[in-house]
A protein has these predicted regions:
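Non-catalytic scaffold segments within catalytic domains of secreted glycoside hydrolases
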Residues: 1-65, 69-74, 85-246
């Protein structure tokens, strides 16, 4: 092992999620997301903090990417906020949203940093939740595929690596089993499986469109596999059940 060297083409990088870093939650036509609403429920986040400003990546992305280059990173995995591209989830496209991500991608390429795009990292347009329940309804499949297709057409020539859904097993379990993420439901096992079913279908149909529009690209579904996380979730569920029994 002492003589082992990483391959020259290994992609050392960093990752972020739109809601966690961008801020600018109402700027340039962006719509409200499920997380924008959820964090305003008292007690749902540490000290009731929000992502309204976060680390202001929306305004400071050029500085952020430059720092990545100085660190020697070769890739940057970031997510696109669905509500920046289609504010109400299934209506008109917001050109200012597309412009922001195009500039971010171009900035990465300027420093020879491979952009890696996550299509969905948990921030769902609230309008889709209000209209039909978001991932609880099969209507989400067509809306997701349309949204993804818009991204492929706009950025497919510049972005090779894509991820459809980030940690599907996490946002579904924390959203419908432990109430720690939107929509904040507890022990709703039936809907939990229903939501996963719709997410898998959305992924599969998106892959089919991806192969047509970005034939030389690579795509995956990102799942989190970590025993320690599972144990924590189980303990939290047991704790909440005990509290509810009291």
């Amino acid at each position: 092992m002492s003589n082992y060297k990483m391959p020259e083409n290994f992609l050392w990088g960093s990752a972020s999620a739109a809601y966690q870093v961008e801020g600018a939650y109402l700027e340039d036509g962006k719509g409200i997301t499920n997380w924008d609403k959820f964090v305003r429920i008292k007690g749902k986040t540490f000290k009731n903090t929000t992502g309204d400003i976060a680390v202001d990546h929306y305004h400071r992305f050029k500085e952020d990417v430059r720092l990545m280059a100085e660190m020697g990173l070769k890739t940057y995995r970031f997510s696109i906020a669905w509500a920046r591209i289609i504010p109400d989830g299934n209506g008109e496209v917001n050109e200012k949203g597309l412009k922001f991500y195009e500039e971010l991608i171009d900035e990465c390429l300027k420093y020879n940093i491979e952009p890696m795009v996550t299509i969905f990292h948990w921030d769902l347009p609230q309008a889709l939740v209000d209209e039909y329940g978001g991932f609880e309804n099969r209507k989400i499949v067509d809306d997701f595929v349309r949204y993804a297709t818009i991204l492929f057409k706009c950025f497919g020539s510049k972005v090779k690596y894509w991820i459809t859904l980030n940690e599907q097993n996490i946002f579904t379990s924390l959203g419908w089993l432990t109430a720690m993420h939107p929509p904040g439901k507890f022990d709703d096992v039936k809907t939990f499986y229903q939501v996963n079913h719709h997410a898998f279908i959305a992924h599969a149909k998106t892959v089919l469109e991806f192969k047509k529009l970005v034939p030389n690209g690579k795509m995956e579904l990102a799942l989190l596999i970590a025993q320690v996380i599972l144990l924590i979730v189980i303990q939290l569920m047991q704790c909440q059940k005990w509290i509810l029994m009291i």
